[in-house]
Every structure is written in structure tokens, then in C-alpha cells.
Amino acid sequence: MRPEPPHHENAELAAMNLEMLESQPVPEIDTLREEIDRLDAEILALVKRRAEVSKAIGKARMASGGTRLVHSREMKVIERYSELGPDGKDLAILLLRLGRGRLGH
């Protein structure tokens, strides 16, 4: 029977094994991460475009004597994003804020 190394050596070996595992790329994970990166780039571009369009709508509405925002419209946006759960509502509020700025500021 082989004697076990002291506890601190076990911890060092475990840490070395973990480092080796983490440094070895897993092709499927790398591919999925690349897809996430592409999706993030698309999402960012769409969010920026959404904010631009929203600001243009606000300017046009104000120029024609309307209000800065339409509450019922914003509620429809929040309702749409609520499909994603509670975080969806938060996401909708952030998107609305990006398009018009914070209310009262």
C-alpha cells in the first residue's frame, strides 16, 4: 500500500490539476462562447438603433405638440418584455430609459 502524501501536497496537486483542466480548451464551449459574443454584438447594435429610433420618435412627437412619452405605449413595451419574467420587465425599463432618458431628470 502506498503512503498518502501530506494534506498540503494533495491540495497542491488538486490545484495543479484544476489549472490544467481550465487551460485546456473545450471545443464545444469555445464554439458556444463565440456564438454568445456574436449575439452580444448584434444585441448591442440593435439596442443602440432602438434608442436612436425612440429618440427620433420623441422629438417628432414633441415637435408636433405631443407629450414626451406615451404611458400606454411604454406599458405595452413592459408587458411584451415581461414574457422573460421579472428580469424582462427590468430590461424593458432600461431600454425605455435608453431611448428617452430618466424621467424627471
UniProtKB/Swiss-Prot annotation:
Keywords assigned: Amino-acid biosynthesis, Aromatic amino acid biosynthesis, Cytoplasm, Isomerase
Key word Isomerase present: yes
Name of this chain's protein: Intracellular chorismate mutase
Lineage: Bacteria, Bacillati, Actinomycetota, Actinomycetes, Mycobacteriales
GO biological process terms, semicolon-separated: amino acid biosynthetic process; aromatic amino acid family biosynthetic process, prephenate pathway; chorismate metabolic process; salicylic acid biosynthetic process
E.C. number: 5.4.99.5
PANTHER family named in the record: CHORISMATE MUTASE
Subcellular location: Cytoplasm
Site positions per UniProt: Important for activation via AroG: G101, R102, L103
Organism of origin: Mycobacterium tuberculosis (strain ATCC 25618 / H37Rv)
Gene Ontology MF term list: chorismate mutase activity
